[in-house]
Structure formats: structure tokens, C-alpha cells
């Protein structure tokens, strides 16, 4: 394990030997990745030139894998002689607000534009297909603007993109690029889990899209429904405005896409497993349990903990 700190004077310090506990946390939406370190006040910490300040760069690598590149945002010390550091990746700088008026842009282009405006580094930004006719956001969190654009990609093109910071570079990946060759299950690194099946949130068996016709002055509806699931669960409907510039065929296609996304029972798992640093929020992994055959799950949140020689991870995962 390698943990490096680079301060504003350009000095590079290897603090690997000082770390007693490490936690690396990632989430699919709305949060930067977090690295939490507990340092023992000894060894290199006693060096007269050693210093850690807010804003310093922190790098974490292990077994040849570059895991985290971020910046110190808080430090806590106390009488126990332990120093606790919290660092965030570049996405932390997207939590500020901004205003944008953009026409005919893709989510990929929105990310590139915001990153350029705020001096953030980008890496691989894979192609998104949906062109947002008009994006108007006033005094809104930059990350929310990006996630909204990615939501349009999912809604209109059915493509669930992963947006994250990959060791210091904002990255956008298609689902196929996020698939890991990893199976969790009994005998496959998993040692505890809880399973939930629900139709209580984000499940709809009927979609009502509407569009106001300026010529006739009437509101036109485009319904699509799964009658079998309406009988099974009752009417669970989504009522939503369609794009003003979309034609009838496009609206009907969008309604069908929304039904395919939402017309199902939600299957989610909370998993405790032996740690594997390849796993982060946004990855797809395979899970094998007695309750079902091997199935592909999306990692919604992921928390790694390293304490001495022990490495575990806690995952919230779901079928999409």
C-alpha cells in the first residue's frame, strides 16, 4: 500500500507507515469520493519539515492499482495523538453552483464545458447519444447539472452512464466499460448480505406523457401500460411532461423506454465481502445466491475499509 502527500511547497511525503485505518467511499450520484485516514503521531510525523495542510494532494495506490487522487479538506487531532484526515476527489469542486444556457448539447459536452470553465481535469469521456434541445440551469449545483444531463441520456436512450473521478481525471463511461469480471457469493468472497424486493420506490407500470399543443390549445396524452402488472400491483403511474419539440412518434418511443426502465420489482442487496479495490460505485458485478441464479448488479455505493492486514468492503447494489 502506498499513500503519498504532496504539499504546496512541492514536498512529497510517504505516509504509508503512519496509517492505522483507511476508508475509501464512493457513491454513484451526488457525492465526491472520500478517503478517510487515521494517522499515528510517530515516525515521519516527527520530521521538522513534515506538514499536512488543507488543500494538499493525497494519492492512494495498492498492488499496482491507482485508487484515489484527491485533496485534504479537514484534519482532526486530539489528546489520543491520532490525526484524522478527510480528502475528497475532484468532484468535490462540482458542489458549487453555476448557471448555464446551452442548446443542442450532449451530456458528454456538458461535462467538458463545465470542467473547462472551472479548471478541472478530464480523462476518458465516452460518447453520449441524446442531444438536449435546451439546457437552462440558473444558480444550480454543477454536479446536479451534470447528473441531470446524464438522466436525460438514460431516459431517452436507455444508457446508464457512470460519471466519476478516475485518479484525478473526470471520467464518463458506458455500462460495458464498467463491467468487472467478479462474482460475489457463498464461497466467492461474500460473507454477509441482506436482500430487499420492493415496488415502493421508482416502480411504475403505467406511463402518462403529455404535450401541450399550442395550435389547438389542448393537452395531448401518450399513455403506455402493462396491464398484467397493473392487475398484480395496482396502478403505479408516472405523469410527466414530454419535450415540447418532440413529435408523436418520439414521445411514444420515450414512453415505452420509461416503461421498460420502471416496470419491474426492484431488487437490491446490502453486501459485506472481502475487499477488492477494483470495485467502486458505478461498476457492474455478478452475484450468486441461493435466492436466484447468477445475476448482474450495479454498485450504488461502495465503502472499503483497511485496518492492518484486513480489507473488507460494504456494497449497496441493485438490479437495473
PLM feature spans:
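Conserved "cap/hinge" positions at secondary-structure junctions
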Residues: 62, 174, 289-291
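A short, compositionally biased
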Residues: 1-2, 51-56, 155-157, 165-166, ...
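Short beta-strand-centered interaction patches in the first periplasmic/extracellular domains
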Residues: 82-83, 89-90, 126-195
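Short polybasic amphipathic segments
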Residues: 1-7, 58, 169-171, 206-212, ...
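Assembly/oligomerization scaffold segments
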Residues: 1-93, 183-196
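An acidic/polar, Gly/Ser/Thr-rich interaction patch typically located in mid-to-C-terminal regions
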Residues: 21-51, 188-320
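Amphipathic, non-transmembrane alpha-helical segments in extracytoplasmic/periplasmic proteins
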Residues: 37, 72, 87, 99-123, ...
